[in-house]
């Protein structure tokens, strides 16, 4: 296919036009007085959002050269979202500022490769500065502040802080769409997996259609149980002790299932059978998790263990097991805490080593089930459009709080970036020529978030930037109340990881744009007009 090529200044200007179209669309959402953007969807109602990465993903431009510029900045937003989960608008804005300032200098004859070196040195100094001023997250209040700022909503902030407190940092918090108007939090204590009872005749509470067994024994196996003779010796031991039994197996069917149900209906013996969670290797790992949590053993041929030889000592124990139609919850397993900690450490190391996002997500779920529990935030609103917008904000806020726990918090509202300017300025003494210009480009870009937040609030950005620069470190501009405050004391905070990732990703892509000398794109095909209409077939109505 034939290509069209642009060179030098013309190529860079085309990329810049694309960058500006995307960044100008995204940057109106920044800050407490930022506006929303409406995205047209081919199906269903339009989507209203102020999430930078969601907006960026929707943008495709007609001109192929401009579109390349837009796609490059889209990568800044996506990468920042992947690493930190928030700060995508800030990252896009910083990339635009670095590209704008950089291209001015390239047009004036600066060497792009030296500019790139200067930019890299300045960014390293800024990242060091951010690490130095970051503060550890202390308790629930700090988490609520981070989440409130990210979601622009104090109620959501409190909700996320509650969830984080209940399920600990290793727990999993999921966001689901609710059927009701309100947004609420549901905590699942203990280990939950998505398999329910094999037969509804096993329920102990017919009103709620669930089986609740207190202090039961738990048989964990990867075998299929169809012959009652296999487990008869074990059942006799349990009946003698007057205990209840939960069976977690590949399946329970035929004669074995019938016998268990008859005994349950007669009231001689209570037993609930549940299919094992997961598939393949993941099933084996999850059964092992359950065994460690409950202090039992997985009865599997891999270890040479047979069902008919199983004794009560090989079974797991728990304070309570609750089995619903599609879920099973094991509360307070009787496993050895040291063994559980070992298992948690092993899963954590697997999370660090894996390269697959899917595997990582599944490992995180397993970790949460062993370590803390699962919290579900049910998002409700009057309309579907509002609910989707709210769900996006909650997901962003969740990611921001996790980032804050990892690397601490810094003053929000773009203040932290202005506060590291003196540290970056020291780099000027160590460089010269075009490298020095590269450092100055970053010094100018670091002011951009404060300037944009002020402009979105209808104020003159430059005046506010100068006042923040002249103030003590940590003093910033509260755009919501339009006054200068100590940002951390006022609860206006950003996760250090979000601020750092935004700057690093913006500088990385912007440097690529500055060092571009030619761009190559396909020549758009001219659409041919349709062929002549065919004559109708006779005799057809």
Curated annotation (Swiss-Prot):
Its biological purpose: Together with its co-chaperonin GroES, plays an essential role in assisting protein folding. The GroEL-GroES system forms a nano-cage that allows encapsulation of the non-native substrate proteins and provides a physical environment optimized to promote and accelerate protein folding.
Assembly information from the UniProt record: Forms a cylinder of 14 subunits composed of two heptameric rings stacked back-to-back. Interacts with the co-chaperonin GroES.
UniProt xrefs under InterPro entries: Chaperonin_Cpn60_CS, Cpn60/GroEL, Cpn60/GroEL/TCP-1, GroEL-like_apical_dom_sf, GROEL-like_equatorial_sf, TCP-1-like_intermed_sf
Class in the EC hierarchy, top level: isomerase
Location of the protein in the cell: Cytoplasm
Reactions that this protein is recorded to catalyse: ATP + H2O + a folded polypeptide = ADP + phosphate + an unfolded polypeptide
A cellular-component GO term for this protein: cytoplasm
UniProt name for this protein: Chaperonin GroEL
Molecular functions per Gene Ontology: ATP binding; ATP-dependent protein folding chaperone; isomerase activity; unfolded protein binding
Superkingdom of this protein's organism: Bacteria
Keyword Cell wall biogenesis/degradation in record: no
EC number(s) per entry: 5.6.1.7
Binding-site residues, ATP: 29-32, 86-90, 413, 494
Keyword Nucleotide-binding: yes
Keywords attached to this entry: ATP-binding, Chaperone, Cytoplasm, Isomerase, Nucleotide-binding
Region forming the signal peptide: none
Entry's family note: Belongs to the chaperonin (HSP60) family.
BP GO annotations: protein refolding
UniProt-listed PROSITE patterns: CHAPERONINS_CPN60
Originating species: Acetivibrio thermocellus (strain ATCC 27405 / DSM 1237 / JCM 9322 / NBRC 103400 / NCIMB 10682 / NRRL B-4536 / VPI 7372)
């Amino acid at each position: 296919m034939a290509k069209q090529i642009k060179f030098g200044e013309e190529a860079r200007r085309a990329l810049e036009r694309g960058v500006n179209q995307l960044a100008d669309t995204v940057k109106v959402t920044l800050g407490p007085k930022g506006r929303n953007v409406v995205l047209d969807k081919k199906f269903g109602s339009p989507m209203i959002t102020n999430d930078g990465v969601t907006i960026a993903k929707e943008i495709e431009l007609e001109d192929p050269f401009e579109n390349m510029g837009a796609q490059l900045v889209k990568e800044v937003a996506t990468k920042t979202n992947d690493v930190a989960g928030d700060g995508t608008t800030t990252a896009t804005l910083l990339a635009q500022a670095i590209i704008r300032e950089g291209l001015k200098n390239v047009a004036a004859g600066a060497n792009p490769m030296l500019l790139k070196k200067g930019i890299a040195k300045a960014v390293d100094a800024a990242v060091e500065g951010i690490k130095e001023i970051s503060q550890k997250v202390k308790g629930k209040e700090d988490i609520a502040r981070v989440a409130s700022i990210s979601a622009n909503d104090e109620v959501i902030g409190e909700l996320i802080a509650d969830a984080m407190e209940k399920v600990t940092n290793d727990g999993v918090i999921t966001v689901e769409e609710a059927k009701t108007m309100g947004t609420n939090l549901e905590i699942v204590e203990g280990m939950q997996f998505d398999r329910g009872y094999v037969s509804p005749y096993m329920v102990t509470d017919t009103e709620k259609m669930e089986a609740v067994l207190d202090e039961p024994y738990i048989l964990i196996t990867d075998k299929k149980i169809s012959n009652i003779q296999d487990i008869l010796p074990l059942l006799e031991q349990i009946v003698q002790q007057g205990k209840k039994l939960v069976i977690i197996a590949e399946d329970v069917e035929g004669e074995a299932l019938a016998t268990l149900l008859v005994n349950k209906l007669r009231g001689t013996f209570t037993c609930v059978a549940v299919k094992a969670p997961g598939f393949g290797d993941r099933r084996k790992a999850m059964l092992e998790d359950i065994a460690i949590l409950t202090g039992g053993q997985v009865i599997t041929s891999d270890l040479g263990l047979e069902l008919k030889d199983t004794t009560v000592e090989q079974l797991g124990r728990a304070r309570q097991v609750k089995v619903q139609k599609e879920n099973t919850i094991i509360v307070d397993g009787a496993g050895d805490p040291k063994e559980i900690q070992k298992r948690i450490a092993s899963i954590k190391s697997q999370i660090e080593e894996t390269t697959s996002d899917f595997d990582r997500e599944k490992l995180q779920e397993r970790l949460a089930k062993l370590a803390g529990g699962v919290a579900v935030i049910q998002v409700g609103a009057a309309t579907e459009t509002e609910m989707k917008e709210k769900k996006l904000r909650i997901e962003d806020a969740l990611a921001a709080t996790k980032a804050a726990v990892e690397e601490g918090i810094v003053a929000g509202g773009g203040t932290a970036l202005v506060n590291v300017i003196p540290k970056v300025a020291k780099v000027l003494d160590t460089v010269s020529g075009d490298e020095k210009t590269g450092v100055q480009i970053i010094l100018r870009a670091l002011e951009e978030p404060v300037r944009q937040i002020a402009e979105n609030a209808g104020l003159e950005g430059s005046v506010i930037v100068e006042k923040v620069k002249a103030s003590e470190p940590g003093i910033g501009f509260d755009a919501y109340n339009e006054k200068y405050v100590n940002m951390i004391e006022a609860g206006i905070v950003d996760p250090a990881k979000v601020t750092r990732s935004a700057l690093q990703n913006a500088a990385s892509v912007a440097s690529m744009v500055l060092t571009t000398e030619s761009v190559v794109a396909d020549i758009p095909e001219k659409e041919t007009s349709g062929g002549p209409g065919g004559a109708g077939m006779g005799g057809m109505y």
